[in-house]
């Protein structure tokens, strides 16, 4: 997202680095659901390791709640920085959605856990998680399709006339994304299917941990895990495309077809990464992703803070007029190097490398900022 969110100029962007205008998808539209998916996968391994160390269900729930509150608060801080106009500050956001989805999905998982047996071991009931996931996806489709919106009618999926946008306006008023004004891409209604994205990751994580799946990286285990992920992922891609004519793939609405499609895509990517990294041992190419992942939310927040400061605070330009830090650096160091669209891309790549260097320093010193 750092690459996508920080071009040199918003007027010059290669199409894969832009979001789809409304229906449909681009590679950029895969990033957020992939992150939520992997949150679900990692959750199952984290809960298992904490439980093995003696953590109770209540302790896990408190940990999840505290972590969610911190992430949500960081998101609000980023939205308000630097002026904090509370009367019109945006309430939703990327980090806020991560916090809510993580919290609700984790509590659902914990509620579905089997009580400890005499030996102290617990187990995870999968059926309730599947049911919750299906209810979220089908219920969201039904609500968006059949509940009439005052002044617009029923079944509208355009930016202003859909049920989610109406609820956002009624509940949050002026506290919406400033560029859309009448709706929010991380709004209230679309958060429900986003929770399902995390739960799909939960199901995959639990399957990978299941005693019915061969453990380790031997040939049989590798075949089962890779084939399972690729097959399930391919099914998700096909089903998502089949649903598209009835409930279009749409990132802003986080439609049910979008959840199934991106969930399938994420499983395929996870299967390929597992095969390349864990089975074949091709690890070096993934080092930058590993380094970024060790402090992902911290770096996302800090890079967003600096990016926002760079377009607010000004310096004196060559003509003695005030220009933003962002414009000054871009115009002076990148515009002379290439065509406008390539100069814009070079700026974004430079920004990525800058934060990769900082993250690498933290990684080398084993500094991992836990949230």
Please give the residue ranges for each predicted region:
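Functional transmembrane helices that form membrane-embedded active or gating regions
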Residues: 227-235, 256, 279-303, 370-371
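Kinked, hydrophobic transmembrane alpha-helices enriched for aromatic residues
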Residues: 1-11, 70-82, 239-243, 293-314
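Extracytosolic (periplasmic/ER-lumenal) interhelical loops and adjacent juxtamembrane/interface segments
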Residues: 8-25, 145-187, 314-343
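A conserved active-site cap/scaffold subdomain adjacent to cofactor or substrate pockets
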Residues: 183-211, 219-239
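N-terminal signal-anchor module of multipass membrane proteins
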Residues: 1-60, 296, 302-303, 313, ...
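Membrane-interface transmembrane-helix boundary segments in multi-pass integral membrane proteins
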Residues: 25, 184-194, 251-263, 267, ...
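Membrane-interface helix caps and helix-loop-helix hairpins in membrane proteins
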Residues: 82-92, 245-256
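Membrane-interface helix-loop-helix modules in multi-pass inner-membrane proteins
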Residues: 47-111
């Amino acid at each position: 997202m750092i690459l996508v969110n920080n071009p040199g100029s918003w007027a010059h962007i290669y199409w894969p680095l832009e979001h789809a205008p409304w229906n449909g998808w681009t590679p950029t539209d895969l990033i957020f659901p992939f992150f939520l998916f992997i949150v679900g996968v990692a959750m199952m391994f984290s809960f298992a390791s904490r439980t093995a160390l003696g953590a109770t269900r209540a302790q896990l729930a408190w940990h999840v709640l505290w972590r969610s509150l911190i992430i949500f608060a960081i998101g609000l801080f980023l939205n308000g920085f630097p002026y904090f106009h509370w009367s019109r500050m945006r309430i939703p956001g990327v980090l806020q959605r991560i916090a809510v989805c993580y919290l609700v999905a984790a509590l659902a998982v914990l509620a579905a856990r089997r009580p400890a047996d005499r030996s102290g071991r617990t187990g995870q009931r999968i059926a309730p998680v599947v049911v919750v996931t299906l209810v979220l996806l089908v219920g969201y489709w039904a609500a968006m399709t059949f509940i009439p919106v005052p002044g617009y009618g029923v079944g509208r999926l355009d930016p202003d006339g859909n049920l989610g946008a109406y609820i956002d306006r009624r509940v949050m008023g002026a506290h919406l994304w400033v560029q859309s004004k009448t709706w929010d891409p991380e709004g209230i209604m679309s958060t429900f299917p986003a929770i399902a994205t995390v739960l799909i990751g939960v199901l995959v994580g639990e399957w990978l941990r299941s005693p019915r799946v061969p453990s380790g990286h031997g040939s049989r285990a590798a075949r089962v895990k890779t084939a399972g992920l690729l097959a399930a992922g391919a099914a998700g891609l096909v089903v998502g495309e089949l649903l598209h004519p009835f409930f279009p793939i749409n990132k802003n609405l986080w439609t049910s077809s979008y959840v199934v499609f991106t969930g399938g895509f994420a499983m395929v990517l996870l299967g390929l990464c597992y095969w390349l990294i864990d089975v074949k041992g091709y690890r070096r190419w993934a080092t930058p992703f590993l380094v970024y992942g060790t402090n992902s939310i911290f770096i996302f927040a800090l890079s967003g803070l600096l990016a926002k400061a760079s377009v607010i605070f000004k310096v004196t330009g060559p003509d003695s007029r005030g220009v933003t830090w962002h414009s000054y650096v871009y115009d002076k160091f990148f515009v002379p190097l290439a065509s406008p669209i390539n100069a814009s891309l070079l700026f974004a790549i430079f920004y990525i490398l800058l934060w990769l260097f900082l993250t690498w320093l933290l990684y080398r010193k084993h500094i991992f900022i836990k949230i």
